[in-house]
C-alpha cells in the first residue's frame, strides 16, 4: 500500500470517529454514517468496511457494531468509551488521523 493510500485510510478512520462522536449517545445505522461522511468525498463500501474492522477490532474497540446479517449497511454502530477517549485525544492511535491535526 502506498503512502497516499495509508494516509487516506488513517484520515477516514479519524472522520468516522469524529462523526460518531458528533452523534454520541445515539446509535446510528452505517447508512447514516456513510451519508455523514459525504463531505469527505465518495467513500467506497470496501474502504468503510476496512475502517470499521480496524476501529472495532481486537485491541481497539473504539466502536461497537450490532451486525445486520442481511444488509451490513443497515447495522447499528456507535462509539464506545474508548472511542470517546480517542475522539477527545485523551489517547492516541498511530492508525488514526483527525482532519484538524
Where are these regions (language model features)?
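Short, amphipathic alpha-helical interaction segments positioned at domain boundaries
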Residues: 74-101
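A short glycine/serine-rich beta->alpha loop
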Residues: 3, 69-70
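Short acidic, hydrophobic short linear motifs in intrinsically disordered regions
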Residues: 26-39
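A short, conserved structural fragment
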Residues: 56-69
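Short amphipathic alpha-helical interaction segments
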Residues: 42-58, 74
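Short alpha-helical segments that sit at the start of domains
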Residues: 1-27
